[in-house]
């Protein structure tokens, strides 16, 4: 069984390059539809503007497996443990929706409140 998922994607460190790169990773694994890219100012800290977009695709991965896959991509792209909270990011991939699933646990927050 597959589920339709939605991700948010953001970067403010060399964002054009990093968004292009994350699209390559995602396109290798899924048939992805992307929104337009939009710019937002950094909030809660002093930093460069973010480039953001949303994407959707169908997956047979369960939510925890997909979350792990997304974390692997972030790590491959150079995201480090100190790039959390309100800080600059090489790449930020957030699972916004996973089908009709509602999960509020330590591992999952779906639908995402971010």
Residue map of PLM features:
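Extreme N-terminal starter segment of soluble prokaryotic enzymes
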Residues: 2-6
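Flexible, gly/pro- and Lys/Arg-enriched active-site loops
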Residues: 35, 42-51, 64-67, 72-114
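Glycine-/small-residue-rich active-site loops that bind phosphorylated ligands and cofactors
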Residues: 14
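Short beta-strand-to-loop capping motifs
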Residues: 9-11, 55-61, 97-100
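Short, surface-exposed acidic-centric catalytic microdomains
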Residues: 17, 21-63
């Amino acid at each position: 069984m597959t589920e339709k998922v939605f991700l948010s994607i953001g970067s403010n460190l060399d964002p054009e390059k990093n968004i292009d790169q994350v699209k390559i990773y995602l396109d290798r694994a899924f048939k992805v539809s992307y929104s337009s890219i939009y710019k937002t100012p950094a909030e809660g800290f002093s930093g460069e503007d973010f480039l953001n977009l949303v994407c959707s695709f169908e997956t047979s991965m369960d939510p925890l497996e997909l979350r792990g896959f997304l974390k692997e991509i972030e790590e491959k792209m150079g995201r480090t443990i100190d790039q959390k909270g309100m800080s600059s990011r090489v790449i930020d991939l957030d699972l916004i929706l996973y089908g009709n699933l509602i999960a509020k646990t330590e591992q999952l927050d779906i639908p995402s409140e971010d």
